[in-house]
Design a protein with these regions (language model features):
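Vicinal oxygen chelate
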Residues: 78-131, 168-169, 215-261
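N-terminal beta-strand motif that seeds the catalytic metal site of vicinal oxygen chelate
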Residues: 1-18, 61-66, 118-146, 161, ...
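Conserved short beta-strand elements that form part of the metal-binding/catalytic scaffold
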Residues: 29-62, 110-118, 162-192, 197-201, ...
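Surface-exposed interaction/gating patches
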Residues: 130-208, 212-214
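Short amphipathic alpha-helices within nucleic acid-binding modules
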Residues: 72-79, 204-209
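Conserved active-site tyrosine of GNAT-family acetyltransferases
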Residues: 20-25, 81, 109, 148-152, ...
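Core segments of cupin and vicinal oxygen chelate
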Residues: 2-49, 93-95, 140-177
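Eukaryotic helix-linker segments that join adjacent hydrophobic helices
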Residues: 65, 71-74, 84
Length: 261
């Protein structure tokens, strides 16, 4: 079994590169750390990047980056995955700020990249924007949530919660969930939502005011969830991707296999 400890980055393809770039820099408040004529990389604070955008004729999620524990090399991770029958390729200098990664495609077509190190940007938080703490979690539509939960245990994830039998929650650290999987056979391979963690409820309230000022409608919330008990709200980004802003989620204590509020 491998050990990853956080969700490092998420890549999107977009038909409107300029508009989505503006959303992440001006609304979310991430710093642009690298840009080419068809790609842009954004950092929440100190990582080289946490969001990457790529111009395309399509719209949606493209890649997911998970960071390995320091005692596991990219080469060793790739070897282990290949021995498990998961076709994995090692790539060097494949993306800015990440010298080496191991890439495979999961059962639902999501491209997963495992990396052990990333350059530091030290860009800090941007004022006059939402400025989340971090990329909090990613929710994915899959053919079978139970199957996905079992698969991601291979990467060191722990199953922390369920909504009935169709929505499974998993963590690789102290967050209630880092990934979750929603059984949606007809939409498998599409993102359900991407969530950004905020500091506290006052930060969430101020962020809702900020969205209103920029005429971005709220789809739902704020309300407190059952799974994780986070206070959350949702809106669409310019491409129609669902974005969650949340705070006050349960903290997972792995050694005790229980949560603290």
């Amino acid at each position: 079994m491998l050990k990853v400890f956080r969700l490092g980055y998420v890549d999107f393809v977009t038909k409107d590169f300029e508009k989505l770039s503006e959303y992440y820099s001006e609304i979310i408040g991430f710093s642009k750390t690298f840009e080419s004529h068809e790609s842009a990389y954004f950092s929440s604070s100190t990582d080289h990047h946490n969001i990457a955008l790529h111009a395309s004729h399509f719209t949606g999620i493209q890649r997911i980056g998970l960071q390995l524990h320091a005692d596991i090399s990219v080469q060793d991770a790739a070897k282990w995955l290949n021995n498990e029958g998961i076709n994995t390729t090692v790539k060097t200098e494949a993306r800015p700020g990440v010298p080496e990664l191991a890439e495979f495609t999961d059962q639902d077509g999501y491209i997963i990249q495992l990396f052990s190190s990333m350059e530091v940007a030290a860009s800090g938080f941007i004022r006059n924007s939402i400025a989340p703490n971090k990329v909090g979690h990613l929710s994915l539509r899959v053919k079978d949530a139970k199957r996905s939960v079992e698969f991601y245990k291979l990467l060191g994830f722990t199953n922390t919660d369920w909504i009935e039998t169709f929505f499974g929650f998993m963590t690789c650290n102290s967050d209630h969930h880092v990934l979750n999987f929603c059984t949606s056979p007809e939409k498998a391979g599409e993102m359900h939502h991407l969530a950004f963690e905020l500091r506290d409820y006052s930060h969430l309230a101020a962020s809702l005011d900020f969205l209103g000022k920029h005429e971005i409608p709220i789809l739902w919330g704020p309300s407190r969830h059952g799974a994780g008990h986070n206070i959350a709200t949702y809106h669409h980004d310019p491409d129609g991707n669902v974005i969650e802003l949340f705070t006050d989620a349960d903290v997972y204590i792995r050694e005790l296999n229980r949560f603290e509020p």
